[in-house]
Amino acid sequence: ISLGLVGSEMCIRDRDLEGTEYSIIDKKIPFYQLAIHGYVNYTGEALNLTQNTQNELLNSAEYGAGLAFTFMKESAFELQNTLYTEYFGADYSAWHDEMLEIYTRYNEELGHTFNQKMVGHEYVTSELTCTIYEDGTKVYVNYSYDELQADDGTVVPARDYVVVR
């Protein structure tokens, strides 16, 4: 990607945050995100339409992605017997409260990193990652079903993220 051609108002939506799942790859390294973070806004899949909302949220926190949701006004039952069943989770009234809770926390804790360069990414353990931003902010993401502790003493609850400023 040529950053000279990218405007700051550009947003890349529905980015595959997980990348390849080849069995010969031990760890995923976010080369793409390291290169563009702070220059271009990007999101993963819409949280309410993905097969695993929690994984997509954790991937977004690890890779510095914004959050995306796709909603419709009508009930999801309107989609039965149509070709649009992939939007079955787009019922706004069903997601409103959870969406506000997820978005508010994410924006309050990570909003200050959106225009910063991502300067580092490391695996603390096989299930605990740390993404580092130019102001020194660290974002720990725990994919484990157990609470984990980072080398600096930061405790990260199971299947959650912690931002250290």
Task: Enumerate the predicted regions with their spans.
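Active-site-proximal substrate-binding groove within the catalytic cores of carbohydrate-active enzymes
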Residues: 2, 6-9, 13-165
